[in-house]
Amino acid sequence: MPKKTILFITLILLALTVLSCKKEVLPKPSSHLRLDYPEANYVQFESQCPFTFEMNADAIIKGEKECGFTISYPKMKATIYLTYKPVNGDINKLLRDAQKLTYEHVIKADDILEQPFLNPQQKVFGMFYQVDGNAATNSQFYATDSTKHFVTGSVYFYAKPNFDSIMPAASYIKNDMQRLLETLKWK
């Protein structure tokens, strides 16, 4: 074998040896976004409207006309919209409209879980909806005494609906909405 060939093979082997001495490349482990929210502290909300409820002290509430409210969660980019309507013999229409609003999300929803709500002592009856999937809203409810008062609530996020991404915030706010419904009282 000529000297040039031996030298060439030796240089290639030496180069391969030097290049192969790098640290072993390991795949990057998958990571998960960790979102920690403070433990909810609830305060009583009072207004001139014919109902009261408890809400998260970290949320910001703004009054709208006709006893409608927005409860904002700026850190989560979410808002609960509360709407009040007096019942004027049109309870069936109000119920139909509230249910229709929820089921408009069937196209994007993976599942809609209905949870009836009954509080006979306070005369508050309603339904809580948990909407799973990439729907515009993840939680909604309606509550009524069936003779005078009707309240609806729904949460919306200011982000493209991607349930996996907003699930921690959606779960946190869902708990706040359930607390609101459970503490709702008519005046």
Language model features by range: what are they?
Residues 46-100:
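Secretory pathway targeting signatures of secreted, lumenal, and periplasmic proteins
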Residues 99-154:
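Signature of long, low-cysteine stretches enriched in small and polar/charged residues
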Residues 29-49:
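Post-signal peptide N-terminal segment of mature Sec-exported envelope proteins
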Residues 17-20:
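C-terminal motif of bacterial Sec signal peptides marking the signal peptidase cleavage site
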Residues 22-28:
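Bacterial lipoprotein signal-peptidase II cleavage site
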Residues 154-187:
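Surface-exposed amphipathic alpha-helical segments
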Residues 1-9:
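Bacterial N-terminal signal peptides that target proteins for export
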Residues 80-89, 140-141, 163-171:
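Second-shell loop/turn segments in exported
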